[in-house]
Amino acid sequence: MRISLHMTQARRPLMLMILDGWGYREEKEGNAILAASTPHLDRLQKERPSCFLETSGEAVGLPQGQMGNSEVGHLNIGAGRVVYQDLTKINVSIRNGDFFENPVLLDAISNVKLNNSSLHLMGLVSYGGVHSHMTHLYALIKLAQEKGLKKVYIHVFLDGRDVPPKAALGDVKELDAFCKENQSVKIATVQGRYYAMDRDKRWERTKLAYDALTLGVAPYKTSDAVTAVSEAYERGETDEFIKPTIVTDSEGNPEAVIQDTDSIVFLNFRPDRARQLTWAFVKDDFEGFTREKRPKVHYVCMAQYDETLDLPIAFPPEELTDVLGKVLSDRGLIQLRIAETEKYAHVTFFLNGGQEKCYSGEDRCLIPSPKISTYDLKPEMSAYEVTDEVVKRILSGKYDVIILNFANMDMVGHTGDFEAAVKAVETVDNCVGRIVEALRTAGGAALITADHGNAEQMENSHTGEPHTAHTSNPVKCIYTGNGEVKALENGKLSDLAPTLLDLLEIPKPEKMTGRSLIVRK
């Protein structure tokens, strides 16, 4: 039988369990998932209905061939439709010319002209396409040049996670050569995303980034950006972890610091890792650290980072209606969202269509992630604590629907440490076993899946170097319940919400264009 709801007695919960970074790849080399001992997931894949889901490219609203990511994945899952992403929207606007007539970007340029000030372009300089894209930076530079700006400064945040760990050297060489041909554009600072894009309130990192931008104070100084990266490699730092470095002029002074009346365009379009630095610049009641200097700037966000801030947004979000959380709430169902810090925003904000609001009947549980520099040092992260809590909640009889994310395979996969990734996979498998048993006891069921791959490819198959980025591989989806489910059809992430509603015997709204994966007996 289907999952049925009895409002006057203990509920039999239906769970969506998202194993972040659990991709499917048949090759064993560099595959931490196949190298791990996973008796619980192996048994479920053998005995229960399963299928494959697409998590990348056009299947999730990204350009063809573009790997998926957690933000995109959870948006598609919660919306029950393909959500066209900011990367796609911005790319299209550049191609058709709308980008160069964007009123928000033009206002930032007008502010510079009015005050004879500087334009600062800051963000992740990467072709990864997860948080930003290099083509957007070059489009911004082109726009500034077309409008005759003479003082344009680039503050380079380096990737090393969504692209190989030392991909930045080539990208920075390309950018530096461009700047030398265009004297109105200069690179002013260089630093890894570990500092400029922290999202876990490790304010000491954000402060280092902020001080470099506003004070011209940083652990290192150098005469050019390429040297900054090369010297960091010599210190043993890879792109993500390159300490803030000031690029100096011929007299040894910073090329630029951010001053009053300047304009800033933060070119990242993904919000979660753009918020903390943005707060440091714009919040009156900011408490993360003491700001020695707070320049009064014209601050532009490429996309919406925080709906509570009244800031100009170059590409504002489209409003997603009738998302999974709202449909469940409108039906009077009680739902739980649970994850540790690293993925909490994904099972709440992103799953709710990029909205901060919490629906009626929606409980949220945040388990703190361990305070360590990189998660290869503790591959278990907080998975066991998440599991302890969710098992209690399952057995409480309170919840109709539970949505859970395990961060381990993705976050440890990003470190490039194969053995640590194997431990992460085994940790998650152990937790899956406990949760499935608790669901069985409670008469519940689960769909177990992932938002994108990662841990299944820990090694670059061409170079043998660590592979730290997401993959474009499909992911598995397993149904653990009993009843009349004969099989699952292959699909994409946007089919998960319609499938959950089908199991709950709730008609999907018209806005959900995904389909149920269920094949019934």
Curated annotation (Swiss-Prot):
GO terms, molecular function: manganese ion binding; phosphoglycerate mutase activity
Keyword line: Glycolysis, Isomerase, Manganese, Metal-binding
Pathway(s) of this molecule: Carbohydrate degradation; glycolysis; pyruvate from D-glyceraldehyde 3-phosphate: step 3/5
Record's keyword annotation contains Isomerase: yes
Domain of life: Archaea
Binding site for Mn(2+) 2: D20, S70, D451, H452
Protein name as catalogued: 2,3-bisphosphoglycerate-independent phosphoglycerate mutase
Amino acids binding Mn(2+) 1: D410, H414, H470
A biological-process GO annotation: glycolytic process
Family label: Belongs to the BPG-independent phosphoglycerate mutase family.
HAMAP family on file: GpmI (MF_01038)
EC id: 5.4.2.12
Record-linked PANTHER family: 2,3-BISPHOSPHOGLYCERATE-INDEPENDENT PHOSPHOGLYCERATE MUTASE
GO cellular component, as recorded: cytoplasm
Family matches, as Gene3D superfamilies: Alkaline Phosphatase, subunit A, BPG-independent phosphoglycerate mutase, domain B
Broad enzyme group: isomerase
Annotated catalytic residues: S70 (phosphoserine intermediate)
Cofactor list: Mn(2+)
Positions contributing to substrate binding: H131, R161, D162, R193, R199, R270, P271, D272, R273, K343
